[in-house]
Amino acid sequence: AITDTVYRVRIVPDAAFSFRAGQYLMVVMDERDKRPFSMASTPDEKGFIELHIGASEINLYAKAVMDRILKDHQIVVDIPHGEAWLRDDEERPMILIAGGTGFSYARSILLTALARNPNRDITIYWGGREEQHLYDLCELEALSLKHPGLQVVPVVEQPEAGWRGRTGTVLTAVLQDHGTLAEHDIYI
């Protein structure tokens, strides 16, 4: 577990797989119950697929998946799905917008985009109700030190004393920073 409600799960597949950054997989609970989860790993990471699963008593949908993983130590997945994958245009500035475990989708796109073009201008806005919901913020800040074009904007709705990031909602922060988004590639 990364936090008391967020789990980093690495699936080691039995067979070869491929996907594009930004796509998701379906965890097969039974024939009629398939549950979508964004992949946090990149297509270049061939040994595993990483998921960030927010599982708690208020999210029984995801908790049932985590319970199965913890009990059986294996799951069946259907991969890949989704059309919101990273496009090949590597020149335009990029904005990534994520909330909570939605960061997994943004992480896959971010790491892939930086591998393709380490100097690309990328801004990632990551919001959470509380600072603890930004569970991989240290990883992002370390990446921003290696990539001068990467700007990390953490946003917390209910900040504690000493919070140094932005407050409010992610979309408010984006709109405060950008008059227009027309010249950016945007992934939400």
What are the residue ranges of the model-derived segments?
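FNR/FR-type flavoprotein reductase catalytic core
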Residues: 47, 57-188
